[in-house]
Swiss-Prot record:
Record-level Gene Ontology MF annotations: ATP binding; protein kinase activity
Modified residues annotated as Phosphoserine in this record: S358
Keyword Nucleotide-binding appears in the UniProt entry: yes
Keyword ATP-binding: yes
Organism whose genome encodes this protein: Schizosaccharomyces pombe (strain 972 / ATCC 24843)
Descriptive protein name: Protein kinase domain-containing protein ppk2
Keyword terms: ATP-binding, Cytoplasm, Nucleotide-binding, Phosphoprotein
Gene name of the encoded protein: ppk2
GO biological process, one term: intracellular signal transduction
Low complexity bias: start-end ranges: 137-152, 206-217
Composition bias type Polar residues, residue spans: 82-104, 294-316
UniProt xrefs under InterPro entries: Kinase-like_dom_sf (IPR011009), Prot_kinase_dom (IPR000719), STE20/SPS1-PAK (IPR050629)
UniProt GO cellular component terms: cell tip; cytoplasm; cytosol
The organism's taxonomic lineage, starting at the top: Eukaryota, Fungi, Dikarya, Ascomycota, Taphrinomycotina
Residue span(s) of domain Protein kinase: 388-637
Length: 665
């Protein structure tokens, strides 16, 4: 047991402890209820109220950003159970014109929300900014992509609508009423109205987007007489490939190049899914390139399209152009019966907007259209793989490939030349010669069958001749007399005369492209596509190798070059030696003159043959006769004798024929 003194001492301590606890509790309650003022402290203790350490600097950069977010989170946790309430999401707020906001306050007693009309506090502004942080914005950001999208904005008006690049510098901001029936058929500059009041979250988000778009000052960038025709969007944004009447797939018609003249911009409005399409056309283009498709019929509920054959994505990228009001269109668009009584249904004079293109663009469009018209008339727009099989590629030179194939039905062997028209530099010469080629038919020329247009390539089909029947394969084996040589030269001259009269120069006449037949007739190959539009003029027309030294850049002198080549062929047949163009050092430019060549065989040939060689070898100097004069006046060609080439062909050994089949590769 404790003594009396110890008990009294312990009792005094416990009494003091209880009084201290009560005073501390009362002071804490007072601090919770009211704040102390400096005047409540004694005057002597004011001097002692000094900070123990300097105040810390506010956080900076990213650390400050996260620190402010963390402090705001702590404040929301501390004051969340008090009277203050958290601001609701943005879609539950409705801003008023007087600066106040209607805040939805969730009461603790009842689950139903209550609406409070009061001014927004700074904490509510903070929560509002946080709710707007994840929403899409139309503001320009400091990124690489913003520089490329400076003139267009990607609009996502509805979840099911595709993003469309809208050039906002060409259009005014239009707004529509709620009912789709009240949509005007034609919107002019007076069809502006205030946006509707949003009632649903979708309309709120759409209204926010439209308000951001309308805030941009674009009204003064469009002429007042520029109008936009409205029609419901019932087709896909990308036009599909249409099947041409002459082909089955990937067919290209001349109307495909009318697409650069049309720039359609389709958007889906808030209600009605309307399609805003502005048809730009040039008056000068319609006069020079009119093919019956310049007028467009616009009907409500239907979208009239242009007959495009390629997959064309609109709007077509345009270069900087000058915009000017268009002249009145002679054929005005037709309107539906429901839009006749509408006050805005009258079509102004400048309903069609005019875009003035440069002269270079107009010439390019006209030239491409001319090319496609030729291709459409001369070529079959089908896949050649449907008609020919067993393709064997035998040579490839630049953009020209040569194939040996077999027809699917009658199994006839043909030669197919494939030209990539997009890679050919002089397409005009290629297509014009293809046009001439379709009318060529001569007994001394390799027969031309047909042409195909598929995947931007031209496939030309020719008659096939066995390489073992080439004249170069027979020269080392057999001796030809002057009468036989005269018969061969006459056959070659007849074929060249027909080519020259048709406006085609061969340029590549050698013994490698002359074929013998059993009907005692010669066939000249490699005559097609021999104009100087291909950089390297080798392996173009026949399945034989053609040297480069016979190619002449000057197209006008090509006819005389063919006459000189005829003389070299005659001299080679007589000598029975490897031809002059077997050696790279010998060419037309480096070969000796006519007198030197004739003196080598002097004493072995007749006078008529000597005169024939001098006339043909001097034709390059433009002093000799052309091929027509040579046929009429040459006495050497008159004493020709019919040669039976069947005997020569039958005497060839089968092994030699197989060895010479692909000797040119």
């Amino acid at each position: 047991m404790l003594s009396n003194s110890t008990f009294h001492e312990h009792h005094a301590k416990s009494h003091f402890h209880n009084n201290a606890c009560q005073s501390n509790a009362s002071s804490s309650a007072c601090r919770a209820s009211e704040d102390h003022l400096v005047s409540s402290f004694p005057n002597d203790s004011i001097i002692d109220l000094q900070p123990s350490r300097p105040a810390p600097e506010p956080p900076k950069k990213k650390f400050g950003y996260y620190a402010r977010r963390l402090s705001g989170h702590f404040l929301s946790l501390i004051h969340g159970s008090g009277n203050s309430t958290r601001s609701p999401p943005f879609h539950l707020q409705n801003q008023k014109s007087n600066g106040q906001s209607e805040v939805w306050h969730s009461s603790d007693d009842s689950g139903s929300p209550k609406r409070l009309n009061r001014s927004r506090s700074s904490k509510e502004d903070m929560y509002r900014r946080r709710s707007l942080h994840g929403l899409p914005s139309l503001s320009r950001r400091n990124s690489k992509k913003s520089s490329t999208l400076s003139r267009s904005i990607s609009l996502h008006l509805r979840s099911e609508s595709a993003p469309i690049s809208l050039p906002i510098h060409l259009y005014k901001s239009y707004s529509y009423n709620h009912s789709p029936s009240s949509l005007p058929t034609v919107l002019n500059s007076q069809a502006l109205s205030s946006p509707p009041v949003p009632t649903t979250p979708d309309e709120v988000s759409t209204n926010r987007l439209s308000s951001s778009t309308s805030s941009m000052n674009c009204r003064n960038l469009v002429p007042d007489n520029f109008n936009i025709s409205i029609r419901p969007n019932t087709t896909n944004y990308r036009s599909s490939i249409q099947e041409n009447s002459n082909g089955n797939r990937d067919s290209i018609s001349p109307s495909a190049y009318d697409a650069p003249l049309l720039h359609n911009v389709d958007t889906q409005s808030i209600d009605g899914f309307v399609s805003v399409a502005s048809h730009f056309s040039s008056a000068s283009t319609a006069e020079s390139l009119d093919d019956g498709h310049s007028a467009t019929t616009i009907q409500q509920g239907d979208v009239s399209s242009y007959p495009l054959s390629r997959s064309v994505s609109t709007p077509v990228p345009m270069s900087p152009i000058s915009i000017s009001p268009a002249k009145p269109s002679p054929q005005s668009p037709k309107l539906s019966q429901s839009a006749v009584g509408h006050p805005s249904s009258s079509i102004p004079a400048a309903a069609m907007h005019k875009v003035s293109y440069s002269d270079d663009l107009m010439r390019f469009v006209a030239r491409e259209k001319y090319y496609l018209q030729i291709v459409d008339c001369l070529c079959t727009q089908k896949d050649p793989l449907f008609f020919y099989t067993d393709f064997t590629k035998i040579c490839q030179q630049d953009t020209v490939g040569t194939y040996v194939a077999r027809q699917t039905l009658d199994k006839e062997v043909v030669v197919i030349k494939r030209f990539d028209i997009s890679a050919v530099t002089h397409r005009r010469l290629l297509l014009e010669e293809l046009q001439r080629l379709s009318g060529l038919s001569h007994k001394n020329l390799i027969r031309y069958n047909e042409s195909f247009w598929y995947l931007n390539n031209i496939w030309s089909v020719f008659e096939y001749k066995d390489p073992s029947t080439k004249l170069s394969a027979l020269i080392p084996k057999y001796f030809f007399s002057e009468l036989n040589i005269a018969s061969i030269c006459y056959e070659i001259s007849s074929g060249l005369a027909f080519l020259h009269n048709s406006g085609i120069a061969h340029h590549n006449l050698t013994t490698e492209c002359i074929y013998l037949t059993k009907s005692s007739c010669l066939k000249i190959g490699n005559y097609a596509f021999s104009s100087p539009y291909i950089e390297r003029q080798t392996n173009r027309g026949a399945v034989s190798h053609v040297p480069d030294w016979l190619i002449e850049k000057n197209y006008k002198e090509g006819f005389m070059k063919d006459v000189k080549s005829l003389g070299l062929v005659a001299l080679e047949i007589f000598q029975g030696q490897p031809n002059f163009f077997r050696k790279s050092i010998q060419s037309i430019q480096l070969t000796p003159n006519a007198n030197v060549l004739v003196n080598r065989v002097r004493g072995l040939i007749s006078q008529e043959f000597k005169e024939f060689l001098l006339q043909t070898l001097q034709a390059e100097t433009l002093q000799g006769p052309n091929i027509n004069m040579l046929l009429e006046t040459s006495s050497f060609l008159e004493k020709r004798q019919t040669l039976n080439f069947e005997i020569c062909l039958n005497n060839l050994n089968l092994r030699e024929r197989k060895a010479s089949r692909y000797s040119y590769l």
